[in-house]
């Protein structure tokens, strides 16, 4: 899981005023992936390339969009870019195999 400090560095946010909101955005990104990808938790725990791609998506696609468009996020109007949707599709194509990658 991507840390709050890592997201703040990526978004270039030097102050702590919005830490609670940024953490909520991070959490919402992972919840979004949980709902979009079958066997999300199993894949995240057992497959490094999957977890790296999921973290990359949260860091580079979800968090910047959510932070910049907070009014839309709060209203439930999520507009994902082509890149964000493509990465989700890649994550959805991973298959979970009991006992390994």
Q: Which residues fall in each region the model found?
A:
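Divalent metal-cofactor coordination and adjacent catalytic microenvironments
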Residues: 1-101
């Amino acid at each position: 899981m991507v840390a709050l400090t890592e997201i703040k560095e990526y978004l270039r946010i030097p102050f702590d005023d919005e830490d609670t909101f940024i953490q909520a955005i991070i959490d919402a990104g992972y919840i979004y992936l949980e709902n979009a990808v079958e066997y999300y938790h199993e894949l995240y725990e057992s497959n490094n390339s999957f977890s790296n791609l999921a973290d990359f998506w949260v860091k580079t696609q979800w968090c910047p969009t959510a932070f910049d468009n907070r009014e839309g996020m709060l209203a439930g109007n999520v507009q994902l870019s082509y890149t964000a949707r493509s990465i989700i599709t890649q994550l959805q194509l991973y298959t979970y195999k009991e006992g390994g990658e």
